[in-house]
UniProtKB/Swiss-Prot annotation:
Organism per entry: Staphylococcus saprophyticus subsp. saprophyticus (strain ATCC 15305 / DSM 20229 / NCIMB 8711 / NCTC 7292 / S-41)
Gene3D superfamilies reported for this sequence: Ribosomal protein S20
Keywords: Ribonucleoprotein, Ribosomal protein, RNA-binding, rRNA-binding
Functional summary from the UniProt entry: Binds directly to 16S ribosomal RNA.
UniProt-recorded name of the protein: Small ribosomal subunit protein bS20
UniProt record similarity statement: Belongs to the bacterial ribosomal protein bS20 family.
Amino acid sequence: MPNIKSAIKRVNTTHTAEERNISQKNEMRTAVKRAHSALESNADNKADLLSFALKKVDKAAQRNLIHDNKAARIKSSLMTAAK
């Protein structure tokens, strides 16, 4: 455990950011899974789920939670499944 005040604050900040990042990444993964399953089952709301998943993937890449190339691969697989 750090003794210096700024180091203590930094640990707290890092912990908070880590929780936020994990939460946002999990939301993105869930959205992608729901979109894939909706596209496979030809659900009525597949367009909404697809756009929501693409939005989540773009935001994750923008926030550097995932690499830009990974975001492109995910979006490509979703769009291919949508055809």
